[in-house]
């Protein structure tokens, strides 16, 4: 079964980050295979509707698929969610970050290397979003997730692919480590000492989740 796309259909849509987007005319996409199994495009639309998804936030490589999904919502008589297409992260040489080749593309790598979750969240926020602006007009790069979410504005997200600057992450991590209370710092340090064989009896990183 194919989705018949009318030649005169309106294919522009509003992206929360990029504003009005003019997408290329899609082909008559297969939405149901011969064996009755739905393809991704039909499955994701129905699944998002059934789960009550209000915002679809995904990488910019999916922009060309959005008109297909919006047409399916319309044909099925469903209310579409809002769409936001994030810029793709880049290495320092501006090449695309590979999930297979770059260890930093895996969250577990940051845990194993000793990066604090608070520092990583702060760093990721800064990749596509400007620093916090204080009442005196100054910028502040160190902020909590609560502060970030309270001030978040889609219109401020940078649509240009940001550079994954490890030096900035290392600096932020140092800031957060120095702010830890002694007890908290010790609790976070013990698993690394255990894994290194320096101490015995301390919980491992895996046991701490």
Model-assigned labels for residue ranges:
Residues 1-99, 106:
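Active-site cores that bind ATP or allylic diphosphates and position pyrophosphate for catalysis
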């Amino acid at each position: 079964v194919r989705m018949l796309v009318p030649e005169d259909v309106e294919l522009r849509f509003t992206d929360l980050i990029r504003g009005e987007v003019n997408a290329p005319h899609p082909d008559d996409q297969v939405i149901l295979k011969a064996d009755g199994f739905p393809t991704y495009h039909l499955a994701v639309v129905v699944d998002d509707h059934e789960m009550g998804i209000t915002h679809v936030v995904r990488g910019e490589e999916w922009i060309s698929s959005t008109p297909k999904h919006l047409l399916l919502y319309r044909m099925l008589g469903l209310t579409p969610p809002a769409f936001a297409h994030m810029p793709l992260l880049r290495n320092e040489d501006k090449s695309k970050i590979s999930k297979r080749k770059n260890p930093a593309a895996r969250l577990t790598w940051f845990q194993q290397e000793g990066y604090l979750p608070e520092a990583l969240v702060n760093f990721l926020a800064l990749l596509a979003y400007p620093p916090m602006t204080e009442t005196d007009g100054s910028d502040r790069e160190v902020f909590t997730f609560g502060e970030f979410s309270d001030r978040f504005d889609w219109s401020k997200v940078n649509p240009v692919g940001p550079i994954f600057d490890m030096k900035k992450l290392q600096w932020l991590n140092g800031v957060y480590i120095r702010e830890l209370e002694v007890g908290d710092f010790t609790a976070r340090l013990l698993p690394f000492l255990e894994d290194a064989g320096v101490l015995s009896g301390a919980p491992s990183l895996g046991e701490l989740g």
